[in-house]
Amino acid sequence: MTFAKITQVAHYVPENVVSNDDLSKIMDTNDEWIYSRTGIKNRHISTGENTSDLAAKVAKQLISDSNLSPETIDFIIVATVTPDSLMPSTAARVQAQVGAVNAFAYDLTAACSGFVFALSTAEKLISSGAYQRGLVIGAEVFSKVIDWSDRSTAVLFGDGAAGVLIEAGASQPLIIAEKMQTDGSRGNSLLSSYADIQTPFASVSYESSNLSMEGRAIFDFAVRDVPKNIQATLEKANLSAEEVDYYLLHQANSRILDKMAKKLGVTRQKFLQNMQEYGNTSAASIPILLSESVKNGIFSLDGQTKVVLTGFGGGLTWGTAIINL
């Protein structure tokens, strides 16, 4: 049996930092209003870099830090809902930028659950024995799809990218247990339409739009459905909530994390948090938190730490992977 392991982490965010006070100059809001409701203080906003640019910087760092040749990468998966273009994929652009000429590459679209879905997929590619090494990256430039006049959504999101190098050769499974879910019937509660349908043959025209969100519906979904998903995954792994060392959840709202910890009966300190500096970076939020945690020495990649990764967001999608790091 081939087991996969995460052997390297990296993250990158644009240099431009936009604070709550900065936002108060362009919309009717203030620092206290934003922070008290979200836990967000700052976010990094691109001044020109696109999604593939952010992802490529992460990919290059992963390869460089591992002293690898780009030609040894077998696959690249980029989780994103803000691609540079429909074709080519963001992953294909990354493959070209880093020179991973032997890698197949594709995007995975699952919004804020994207990194967890992508990691699950990559782990199966490795454990099948067909591939030895791949990059899994979450990358978003949400600033290009936000309505900057809508304070209910514009204050929430940031831009960034992060990822992992996943390789064969572990002595234990990377994923102890997992549970991925989707409910498309609730998809309109978090929506970003991409393109018009305007042809001579169309009976109805669908116009593109900026991001729209039913905030209360999404909050209720997060605090109701997601803890059940985590608990079900813990049961599959035969673990209690307290036996997990750290919980790395999608960084959407600090109040959501407060309620998650309470529902699971876990001390809040186990729920790591960095949304105060990055905002909601969608598919990039979990890997940014993972990369920062390793870089800051909170835990290492020695296989001795049990971590819950949980994403939740548009689709609606949500999923948990309990992993050995």
From Swiss-Prot:
Family: Belongs to the thiolase-like superfamily. FabH family.
The keyword Ribosomal protein belongs to this UniProt entry's keyword annotation: no
Pfam families noted in UniProt: ACP_syn_III, ACP_syn_III_C
Gene Ontology terms describing biological process: fatty acid biosynthetic process
Subunit structure: Homodimer.
A GO CC term attached to the entry: cytoplasm
GO terms assigned for molecular function: 3-oxoacyl-[acyl-carrier-protein] synthase activity; beta-ketoacyl-acyl-carrier-protein synthase III activity
Region of interest (ACP-binding), ranges: 251-255
Note on domains (UniProt): The last Arg residue of the ACP-binding site is essential for the weak association between ACP/AcpP and FabH.
InterPro entries found in the cross-reference section: ACP_syn_III_C, ACP_syn_III_N, FabH, Thiolase-like
Keywords attached to this entry: Acyltransferase, Cytoplasm, Fatty acid biosynthesis, Fatty acid metabolism, Lipid biosynthesis, Lipid metabolism, Multifunctional enzyme, Transferase
EC number: 2.3.1.180
Signal peptide from the UniProt entry: none
Top-level enzyme category: transferase
Compartment annotation: Cytoplasm
Reaction catalysis annotation: malonyl-[ACP] + acetyl-CoA + H(+) = 3-oxobutanoyl-[ACP] + CO2 + CoA
Protein task: Catalyzes the condensation reaction of fatty acid synthesis by the addition to an acyl acceptor of two carbons from malonyl-ACP. Catalyzes the first condensation reaction which initiates fatty acid synthesis and may therefore play a role in governing the total rate of fatty acid production. Possesses both acetoacetyl-ACP synthase and acetyl transacylase activities. Its substrate specificity determines the biosynthesis of branched-chain and/or straight-chain of fatty acids.
Gene (UniProt): fabH
UniProt keyword annotation of tRNA-binding present: no
Protein name: Beta-ketoacyl-[acyl-carrier-protein] synthase III
Pathway as given in its UniProt record: Lipid metabolism; fatty acid biosynthesis
PANTHER family linked: 3-OXOACYL-[ACYL-CARRIER-PROTEIN] SYNTHASE, BETA-KETOACYL-[ACYL-CARRIER-PROTEIN] SYNTHASE III, CHLOROPLASTIC
Active site positions: 112, 250, 280
